[in-house]
Every structure is written in C-alpha cells, then in structure tokens.
Amino acid sequence: MVKTMKCKFCDKKSYIKLKSPKMYLCKEHFVEYFENKVKKSIDKYKMLSKDEKILVAVSGGKDGHAAAWVLKKLGYNIELFHINLGIEGFSEESLKAVKELAEKLEVPLHVVNLKDITGKTMEDIRGKKCSICGTTKRYLMNKFGYENGFDVIVTGHNLDDEVSFILNNLFNWNIRYLAKHEPVLPAHDKFLKKVKIFFEIEEELILKYAEAEEIPYTTVECKYAERAITLKHRAYLNELEKERPGIKYQFLSGYMKNRHLFKVEEEDFQFRECEVCGMTSAGKICSFCRVWKLYKKKKENRN
C-alpha cells in the first residue's frame, strides 16, 4: 500500500514534493510558498515598485501567464501585451488563451498584429525564423510600452531558461552576453526597464502553480521553434538536478556572484535614433526595421 504523504504545515494531502528544501506541501500552502518566493526575488533584486505601470508580455504559454497572475495577486499595476505573429494554429490558440487570462484577471489586454505593422506574418519568413521572431517581439513590446507610458516590461523567463542560456554562452564563450545577463535591465533612452520575476524560479514550480491556480494557458507549441540544443542542455541539467537537488539555483547564484569576471572594457558607445522608426538603435537602421526591410517601404513612400 502506497503511503499518502501529508503537507508539512497541515493535515491535507500533499500536492507537491519540493526537492530543495525537502518538504511536502498541499495545494494551498504551495501557492503561498510560491508567491512568497516570487515576492522575495522581487525585493532581493529591487525589480518592481507598486507605483510603476507594468506591461506583462504574454505569448499564451504558462510562464508569462503565471507572471501576470502572481503580480496581480501581489497588488501590482499590470496590463497585458500580446503579439499575433500570424502562425497558423499556434497564433489562434495563443490569442484565445491570452483573452481568457485577461478576462479572469480583469486587466487591460493590448494585442498587436504583426501583419498590420510589417505587411507580413512569421509564415512569410524564409529560412530560420526564431532569431527574427525574438528581435520582433523585443522591439514591438518595447515600442508599445514606450509609446503608451509604461515604466517596465515583465517577461516570464524562468530559472531553467537562465541556466540554459548561461551554459550555452559558456560553451560558446560569448563574453558580452555573459557580462550583461541580469534579472533587471535598467531603462536607457527609449529602452524601458525589463524584468524577469521568475529569474530564480524553476519551470516545474511555475507549471504546478499554474495548475493549482487554474491559470488559462495553451500547451500548443510553435511549429518553428528551434529547441534541439536547448532541450539537450535542459535534459542534462534536469539529470544533474535529480542527483543534486538545488544545483540549478546554485549554478545561477554562483554566476551572479562572479559575473563581474566577464565584464569587458568597451569603447564609449553612443546610441542613436533609427532613421526609419525613431526608436533607439545601435546603427542608422534598427534591427527590426532592417530584418523586415521597412527602410525600403519608407523610400518607396517618398518616391
């Protein structure tokens, strides 16, 4: 007969077994534990304040949705931002989940359609789409946030994402990325402050929180996602986590303590305004306008 484990803090049946710290928790005490963990992380890194106007990026998946949910419960002033990328099947399901989330949270939802801005969808892009998609999402959410008076952008990147990212950049010795990897990116010119409230939270815990709170999200994945290397990294890290519970967090903590070792001296760099859209750019034309060839449209409109 299998023994039913009880919650550490009450007599209810356990909902989850935490590996680090080792304890069983019922659904109610797990939700309390999770939300306190997020609050501590926000306070630790001075991520957010209650008077800030916060734009939460939601793609339809559990991480962004859980981020919005917990911030609303903690009393922050949030609104949701979603980009319809025009990917058959995926975009429809994502938008449906996002609308349901906004309705449950009773917060404003802002939806931007990629085709309305570029005249194209991600389906129209040939070859590898992921890097262009990343550039597109970062640009559009920052531009929308800047033009609509938001103070900060929150994304749902979690501990597993961060550790995998750091590991990948260590393998490739991308020093510049390693030097700038932070839970909070400060505002600069037209770049809004960006925050990762799940920087220290495992993906597994986010999933269990989403299930416990019955947060609406879609499990449909993008058919173009390039995840081969990332999945291998995660599988390796998950095996290590089984053998040494807490190793992911220890790895991230070690990186945060020693990230100054990756700092490199850089020449004084002056950002400028993109000649096409006017947003902050490293060059004459920003990466978004360049990849979507919007500079060509501007020339055509002049003629």
UniProtKB/Swiss-Prot annotation:
Keywords: 4Fe-4S, ATP-binding, Iron, Iron-sulfur, Magnesium, Metal-binding, Nucleotide-binding, RNA-binding, Transferase, tRNA processing, tRNA-binding, Zinc. One of its GO terms (cellular component) is cytosolic tRNA wobble base thiouridylase complex. The keyword Iron-sulfur applies. It catalyses: 5-methyluridine(54) in tRNA + hydrogen sulfide + ATP = 5-methyl-2-thiouridine(54) in tRNA + AMP + diphosphate. Disulfide bonds: none annotated. Pathway: tRNA modification. Zn(2+) 2 binds at residues 274, 277, 286, 289. ATP binds at residues 57, 83, 137, 156. Its cofactor is [4Fe-4S] cluster; Mg(2+). Binds 1 [4Fe-4S] cluster per subunit. The cluster is chelated by three Cys residues, the fourth Fe with a free coordination site may bind a small ligand, such as exogenous sulfide, thus acting as a sulfur carrier. [4Fe-4S] cluster binds at residues 130, 133, 222. It is an enzyme of class 2 (transferase). The keyword RNA-binding applies. Zn(2+) 1 binds at residues 7, 10, 26, 29. GO terms for molecular function: 4 iron, 4 sulfur cluster binding; ATP binding; metal ion binding; transferase activity; tRNA binding. It holds the Pfam family ATP_bind_3. In TtuA from T.thermophilus, the sulfur inserted into the nucleoside comes from the C-terminal thiocarboxylate of TtuB, but there is no TtuB ortholog in M.jannaschii. The thiolation reaction likely consists of two steps: a first activation step by ATP to form an adenylated intermediate of the target base of tRNA, and a second nucleophilic substitution step of the sulfur (S) atom supplied by the hydrosulfide attached to the Fe-S cluster. Belongs to the TtcA family. TtuA subfamily. PANTHER family: ATPASES OF THE PP SUPERFAMILY-RELATED, TRNA-5-METHYLURIDINE(54) 2-SULFURTRANSFERASE. Catalyzes the ATP-dependent 2-thiolation of 5-methyluridine residue at position 54 in the T loop of tRNAs, leading to 5-methyl-2-thiouridine (m(5)s(2)U or s(2)T). This modification allows thermal stabilization of tRNAs in thermophilic microorganisms, and is required for cell growth at high temperatures. This is tRNA-5-methyluridine(54) 2-sulfurtransferase. It comes from Methanocaldococcus jannaschii (strain ATCC 43067 / DSM 2661 / JAL-1 / JCM 10045 / NBRC 100440) (Methanococcus jannaschii).
